[in-house]
Amino acid sequence: MSAELEEIGSSLIDNKIPAPWAKVSYPSMKPLAAYIVDMVERLVFMKKWIEEGAPSTFWLSGFFFTQSFLTGLKQNFARKYTIAIDLIAWDYEVMNDATFNAGEGAEDGAYIYGLFIEGCRWDADQGCLEESQPKILYTKMPHIWLKP
């Protein structure tokens, strides 16, 4: 067995992502088992998109390279309104998940989800960031409408 295969085997036994996999993968600090679950979720999201068309909301943290997705949104907006892409800036609106309905998706831009914030929480009633609850470091953000 080669040294590389031995290293991969050791990583698998230690529940770590093997170095050759990590070189061609998205960044992850998760142990191997959680990494595989996460990767399967990403593949299911992409497969559903391919088979059923664009979703009404996009799992932003499920993308390997989010910058290309955001650039694609800008390109679509620029083509639709014949505007130079470098003149387009982002605005956003944090949605209230209690009343949010994506329907067919955003007319322009995209609804996104899957973002987390550290050391604070989103107060839907006030529409702003608040102190986090005791002993809670990360909180999930509601859907966000990215508007070019």
Name every feature range the model reports, one short phrase each.
Residues 1-148:
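Long C-terminal appendages of very large multidomain proteins
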